[in-house]
Amino acid sequence: MSKPGLDAEVKPKILFYDIETKPLLAYIWRLGEQVVNHKQLAKWGYRYDIICISYAWNDGTPAKVIHWGYEEQDSRRVIQEFDKIIKQADITIGKNSDRFDVKHINSQRLLHNLPPLPDWMDYTDDLERQIRKYFAFPSYSLDYISKELGLGGKVKMEFQDWIDIVEKLNKKSFIKMCDYNKKDVEDTRALWNKIQPHIKPKFSMATFYGDFRCIHCASKDLKKDGVRFKGKTKYQTFFCKAHGGYAGRVAIPSETKRTIG
């Protein structure tokens, strides 16, 4: 059932995603905390690689996974397939993705001589960055926040599972990794939708549609909710009756088109 005030229109394509990477392998002289030089990296474990990428659209459908193949271990194909998905999205969202996932995916494009997507960063957002900006939790791990907000936490993985996958010792670990990856994405999606009314995301529904509506859910069922000042600018703020929260603001007076920002 559609929310009041939300027309039957083309919806923006919001993509949630998460990657899992291969560990590095190095020769060391002792155990414990130490600095490992790049010259100590073993031949088959000298650079990062992507085992799988899970993704889900913001339509409630289950997450899917693109993996490198238990036997083949071909990450080039993973990036090629995922880039086809990215190009369909209006916004992509991960957790700690600005610092981790995006850079790893960009690196694999470079290493595999695949077409670059330098504008990708223009339409990404990061669940962890938004949570750290607007909230205070004892831990910002996905496992902790997932449990705290009723999603059950992450699928349990052990470091041995990564070894079993990389060395092709146990296919069950590979299957578990894919399930682990998909659960992370589904939790990212659920958490994003839960926190969204409390934050100001990079992606605005009002900007997407190019008119006057809620920046979060695209509803037009709004009411005025007080006046605020920022510097010398006066703003009319709005409340969204559809999702029951902040809907955006408009500068007063404004000679420009009325688009909530």
Protein language model annotation of sequence segments:
Residues 215-219, 242:
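Short, cysteine/histidine-rich loop/knuckle motifs that typically chelate Zn2+
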Residues 226-237:
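Short linker/helix segments within small regulatory modules
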Residues 2-86:
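Conserved RNase H-like, two-metal-ion catalytic cores of nucleic-acid enzymes
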Residues 209-214, 237:
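Residues immediately within or flanking Cys/His clusters that coordinate Zn2+
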Residues 93, 141-208:
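Acidic, Mg2+-coordinating catalytic module of metal-dependent nucleases/exonucleases
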Residues 220-226, 248-250:
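Short, non-ligating residues that shape and space the ligands of small metal-coordination modules
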Residues 59-144:
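Conserved DEDDh/DEDDy metal-dependent 3′-5′ exonuclease domain
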Residues 237-261:
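Short metal-binding segments enriched for Cys and/or His
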